[in-house]
């Protein structure tokens, strides 16, 4: 029996000493030159602020955007050229029209029931020694907040309506007429309605925002020749009409309607007093396509980016969202190149010294390998206004 035990132990020892051939090493992913940064880092927040300021300046219509949180950020450091940042920003629409050119700090996000929210992707170039701040490209996608979900939270809150609603146009016309009646000399005309909401108070109520322009005739002119109709808007008004419900009053008494209006006039577009960071505007407003997409024809001129407005998610047809991931609710694409090795972007016009100055631009990164500190903390933590 002892001999048998010894034989078993020797067999086990031999098995333990036997080695299997080593597995082949796994192929290593090449190191990316894009360095992930924390989304709440003070420098990152400053870069995000510069980028969003430039996005707002590039708009000719709509409302200014504010930063809700940094969703993702990568930095590509390029020696004497400085850094190119790849930013994904969650944004909220503010109460400031882009034509007002107000400072970002003076603009406030809208109430939750009228919120417009979304996501922007942007590339932003910084060269601190040369004092260069430049936005080569951006794209944004925005949606209004879900009316169904806001009504669940606040059933009596105002609800956004279509800008072409006849009652909204009537509210704009009547409130502007009231403003003109109090204007000492100039008259103003409606350009277009930019926001519209309705609510039941003591009766139907309509709240509108609209752009105005100077009318070709003043109040003192009985007749005058018409000016060109494409004059620029000079201000924005907020008007409302509230019609009282008087069912308990005899029919001989007319229905009461309350009309309110306030208007704000835009400052000169030539210079914005007190505007921060003038270096952000270095470079032309519109660039040849060769500076924004190296493989395109140099004769084509295109803007640096765009803002896409989509309907609220509840308004989409089932087949439009069927099978889609949550990220597809805010499709934002920003690829100046699809070359994994990158392409060059000529930014010589930003620099005073002679010689070519080129940035290496890589495909915009996805979620892989982003910082564990992203997304960052949000300013408005309402889940109704946070993209996935």
Swiss-Prot record:
<feature type="compositionally biased region" description="Polar residues">
    <location>
        <begin position="279"/>
        <end position="300"/>
    </location>
</feature>
<dbReference type="InterPro" id="IPR001363">
    <property type="entry name" value="Prot_inh_fetuin_CS"/>
</dbReference>
<feature type="region of interest" description="Disordered">
    <location>
        <begin position="270"/>
        <end position="343"/>
    </location>
</feature>
<feature type="disulfide bond">
    <location>
        <begin position="154"/>
        <end position="157"/>
    </location>
</feature>
<dbReference type="InterPro" id="IPR025764">
    <property type="entry name" value="Cystatin_Fetuin_B"/>
</dbReference>
<feature type="disulfide bond">
    <location>
        <begin position="237"/>
        <end position="263"/>
    </location>
</feature>
<feature type="disulfide bond">
    <location>
        <begin position="217"/>
        <end position="224"/>
    </location>
</feature>
<keyword id="KW-1015">Disulfide bond</keyword>
<feature type="disulfide bond">
    <location>
        <begin position="120"/>
        <end position="140"/>
    </location>
</feature>
<feature type="glycosylation site" description="N-linked (GlcNAc...) asparagine">
    <location>
        <position position="139"/>
    </location>
</feature>
<feature type="domain" description="Cystatin fetuin-B-type 2">
    <location>
        <begin position="152"/>
        <end position="264"/>
    </location>
</feature>
<comment type="function">
    <text>Protease inhibitor required for egg fertilization. Required to prevent premature zona pellucida hardening before fertilization, probably by inhibiting the protease activity of ASTL, a protease that mediates the cleavage of ZP2 and triggers zona pellucida hardening.</text>
</comment>
<dbReference type="GO" id="GO:0008191">
    <property type="term" value="F:metalloendopeptidase inhibitor activity"/>
</dbReference>
<dbReference type="GO" id="GO:0004869">
    <property type="term" value="F:cysteine-type endopeptidase inhibitor activity"/>
</dbReference>
<dbReference type="Pfam" id="PF00031">
    <property type="entry name" value="Cystatin"/>
</dbReference>
<feature type="domain" description="Cystatin fetuin-B-type 1">
    <location>
        <begin position="28"/>
        <end position="141"/>
    </location>
</feature>
<keyword id="KW-0481">Metalloenzyme inhibitor</keyword>
<feature type="glycosylation site" description="O-linked (GalNAc...) threonine">
    <location>
        <position position="295"/>
    </location>
</feature>
<feature type="disulfide bond">
    <location>
        <begin position="96"/>
        <end position="107"/>
    </location>
</feature>
<feature type="signal peptide">
    <location>
        <begin position="1"/>
        <end position="18"/>
    </location>
</feature>
<keyword id="KW-0732">Signal</keyword>
<keyword id="KW-0677">Repeat</keyword>
<keyword id="KW-0325">Glycoprotein</keyword>
<dbReference type="InterPro" id="IPR000010">
    <property type="entry name" value="Cystatin_dom"/>
</dbReference>
<keyword id="KW-0278">Fertilization</keyword>
<comment type="similarity">
    <text>Belongs to the fetuin family.</text>
</comment>
<keyword id="KW-0483">Metalloprotease inhibitor</keyword>
<keyword id="KW-0964">Secreted</keyword>
<feature type="glycosylation site" description="O-linked (GalNAc...) threonine">
    <location>
        <position position="292"/>
    </location>
</feature>
<dbReference type="GO" id="GO:0005576">
    <property type="term" value="C:extracellular region"/>
</dbReference>
<feature type="compositionally biased region" description="Basic and acidic residues">
    <location>
        <begin position="367"/>
        <end position="381"/>
    </location>
</feature>
<feature type="region of interest" description="Disordered">
    <location>
        <begin position="367"/>
        <end position="388"/>
    </location>
</feature>
<protein>
    <recommendedName>
        <fullName>Fetuin-B</fullName>
    </recommendedName>
</protein>
<feature type="glycosylation site" description="N-linked (GlcNAc...) asparagine">
    <location>
        <position position="40"/>
    </location>
</feature>
<dbReference type="GO" id="GO:0010951">
    <property type="term" value="P:negative regulation of endopeptidase activity"/>
</dbReference>
<dbReference type="GO" id="GO:0007339">
    <property type="term" value="P:binding of sperm to zona pellucida"/>
</dbReference>
<dbReference type="GO" id="GO:0005615">
    <property type="term" value="C:extracellular space"/>
</dbReference>
<keyword id="KW-0597">Phosphoprotein</keyword>
<dbReference type="InterPro" id="IPR046350">
    <property type="entry name" value="Cystatin_sf"/>
</dbReference>
<dbReference type="InterPro" id="IPR050735">
    <property type="entry name" value="Kininogen_Fetuin_HRG"/>
</dbReference>
<feature type="modified residue" description="Phosphoserine">
    <location>
        <position position="321"/>
    </location>
</feature>
<dbReference type="GO" id="GO:0007338">
    <property type="term" value="P:single fertilization"/>
</dbReference>
């Amino acid at each position: 029996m002892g001999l048998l035990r010894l034989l078993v132990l020797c067999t086990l020892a031999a098995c333990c000493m036997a080695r299997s051939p080593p597995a082949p090493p796994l192929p290593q992913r090449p190191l990316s030159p894009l360095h992930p940064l924390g989304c709440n880092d003070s420098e990152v927040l400053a870069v995000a602020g510069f980028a969003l300021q430039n996005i707002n300046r590039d708009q000719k219509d709509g409302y200014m955007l504010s930063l809700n949180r940094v969703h993702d950020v990568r930095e590509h450091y390029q020696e004497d050229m400085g850094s190119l940042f790849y930013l994904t920003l969650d944004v909220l629409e503010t109460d400031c029209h882009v034509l007002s050119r107000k400072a970002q700090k003076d603009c406030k996000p809208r109430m939750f029931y009228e919120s417009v929210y979304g996501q922007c992707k942007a590339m932003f170039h910084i060269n601190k020694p040369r004092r260069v701040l430049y936005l080569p490209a951006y794209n944004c996608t925005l949606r209004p907040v879900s009316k169904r979900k806001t009504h669940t939270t606040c059933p009596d809150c105002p609800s956004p309506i279509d800008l072409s609603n006849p009652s909204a146009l009537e509210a704009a016309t009547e409130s502007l007429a009231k403003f003109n009646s109090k204007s000492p000399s100039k008259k103003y005309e409606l350009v277009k309605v930019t926001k519209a909401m309705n609510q039941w108070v003591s009766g139907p109520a309509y709240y509108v925002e609209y752009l105005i322009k100077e009318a070709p005739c003043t109040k003192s002119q009985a007749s005058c020749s018409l000016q060109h109709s494409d004059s620029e808007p000079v201000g924005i008004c907020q008007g409302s009409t509230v019609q009282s419900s008087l069912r308990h009053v005899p029919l001989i008494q007319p229905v009461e309607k309350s009309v309110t209006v306030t208007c704000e006039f835009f400052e000169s577009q030539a210079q914005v007093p007190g505007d921060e960071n003038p270096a952000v505007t270095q470079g032309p407003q519109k660039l040849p396509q060769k500076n924004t997409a190296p493989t395109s024809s140099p004769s084509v001129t295109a803007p640096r980016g765009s803002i896409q407005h989509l309907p609220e998610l509840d308004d989409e047809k089932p087949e439009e969202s069927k099978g889609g991931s949550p990220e597809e609710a805010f499709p934002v694409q920003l690829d100046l190149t699809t070359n994994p090795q990158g392409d060059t972007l000529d930014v010589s016009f930003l620099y005073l010294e002679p010689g070519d100055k080129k940035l290496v631009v890589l495909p915009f990164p996805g979620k892989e390998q982003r910082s564990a500190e992203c997304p960052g903390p949000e300013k408005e933590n309402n889940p109704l206004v946070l993209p996935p």
